[in-house]
Structure formats: C-alpha cells, structure tokens
A protein has these predicted regions:
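Short amphipathic alpha-helix that is part of the acyltransferase structural core
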Residues: 1-25, 97-135
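Conserved donor-binding loop and adjoining core beta-sheet/short helix segment
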Residues: 2-5, 9, 15, 23-78, ...
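Acyl-donor-binding surface of acyltransferase catalytic domains
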Residues: 47, 52-113, 202, 206, ...
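Conserved acetyl-CoA-binding loop-helix of GNAT-fold acetyltransferases
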Residues: 63-70, 176-178, 182-196, 216
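Conserved active-site tyrosine of GNAT-family acetyltransferases
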Residues: 89-90, 213-219
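A mid-sequence, solvent-exposed acidic-amphipathic segment
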Residues: 119-175
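Recognition helices and adjacent regulatory flanks at domain boundaries
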Residues: 152, 162-164, 185-196, 205-207
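Helix-turn-helix
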Residues: 210
Length: 230
C-alpha cells in the first residue's frame, strides 16, 4: 500500500546515499510535507516524491502495477528512477536513459567563481535550456533560501549545486553563453565549484551527447539512470 509521508520520521529507511535518495531528501529538506504541489509517499522500502508533474522513485516496489497506476493517477509527466526499475513502467511511459558521472579529475585549489543573482543566472541558463523564468525562480529561490541548493557563475558559465548531502553533491543546469562556448569556461567553473566542495563525491547527470565533454574535464561514468516520459 502506498501511503503519503506527513512527517520526517516517515523517511526513515530512505538510503543515506544515491542519486534518487538524495533528490528526494533534498526536496523534503526544501519543502517539507505540507504542500499539495510537492508530496512524498512510501510503499514499504520504496520512496516517491512528486513535485508538480515530476516524480522520483527510490527503491524496489513489491507491487509495480500499483505503483504504475499510482503515478498515472498523480498525473506525472516524467519519472526519474534506477534503470533496472524502468521497464515496469513502459508503457505508457517511454524511456530515455541518462548517464551518472562522478568527478575523478584533479581538483584545482583556486576558487574563482562567484554567486550570481537569480536573474543573472537565468540570463545564462535560458540560452541552453527551455525554461520559464517564474516557475524556475520560485523553485530555485525556495531551495536556496532553505540551504538545499546554490548557484555559481564565472561571468560566462553558470551551474547549480542541486544538493550537497551526506558527502554527495549533484551539479545541474550547467550552461555557457553562446559566444563563450568551446573556450573552457564551463570546465573552469566546474573545477572551481569542486574545489569549494572538498571531501565530497561530486556527480553530474548527462545525455549521451555530452559524455565525451564530461570525460574530458575529469568525470568518469558510473551507471545509467532512467528518465521516463509520458
């Protein structure tokens, strides 16, 4: 049976490490259990977060038919989960895998980035991602205000530290202004951010087309993750 999480105690049993677990944990740290647009659920050892129409599933679910029906009932349009779990949801979802990469390169001792305003960050991000300002601003400002996420920039490039939890950090929304692409700006920013996060395992999720780029700047492949779309 899938039950809604109403208290942090209900998260006991959520693994301390792993991308899915940290995505759910960081989302709970930002929003808690009191919003209808951001909900958390549990089915034994399976944990689920639903933010608007996006879901994250962590752990094996005994009744995958129930879980699939539940996600459809919630009206989710995309699901992030372990690759091994994904086939249980296809159809009606279609599957598009991404790559989890871990930074293994030599970390510079120089910290050269700054913290941009949300508007400054968006001016860079909008050149690489199809995102609307208002929902992005509301979510990002909330995460930053609650100490869950942070932004970093160096004038030409920008990125988000989506979470920094239990010795693991995930970099996301990495973008460079068109006129500065191919000049090493993103690499310098990533190295600077990694230098500011000592003693962490630092990860990024990327599509196949960016594998070579991340390998060149010091990331190594860890595993495939599934993104399910509807």
């Amino acid at each position: 049976m899938i039950k809604r999480i109403t208290d942090v105690a209900d998260l006991r049993g959520l693994p301390p490490h792993g991308t899915e677990a940290q995505k759910i944990r960081s989302l709970y740290n930002a929003y808690g259990a009191g919003y209808d647009f951001c909900r958390f659920y549990r089915a034994e050892s399976c944990f689920i977060s639903v933010l608007d129409n996006s879901a994250v599933v962590c752990g094996e679910c005994v009744d995958t038919e129930e879980l699939r029906g539940f996600l459809l009932m919630c009206g989710v349009s995309d699901v992030f989960c372990e690759a091994g779990l994904a086939d249980n949801f296809c159809p009606p979802f279609s599957r598009s895998d991404v790559n989890l990469m871990r930074f293994c390169g030599e970390i510079s001792t120089e910290i050269s980035h700054s913290v941009p305003t949300l508007s400054e960050a968006f001016e860079i991000l909008k050149t690489a991602f199809s995102i609307d300002f208002e929902p992005w601003y509301l979510d990002m400002s909330h995460r930053i205000r609650h100490g869950v996420s942070s932004l970093a920039a160096n004038g030409a490039s920008c990125l988000c530290v989506q979470y920094d939890l239990n010795g693991e950090a995930l970099l996301s929304q990495i973008a460079t202004l068109p006129e500065h692409r191919g000049k090493g700006s993103a690499k310098r920013l990533i190295n600077s951010v990694c230098a500011s996060l000592p003693n962490r395992e630092i990860f990024v999720l990327c599509e196949d087309g960016l594998l070579d780029f991340y390998k060149k700047i010091g990331f190594s492949f860890v595993e495939r993750k599934a993104v399910l779309l509807r």
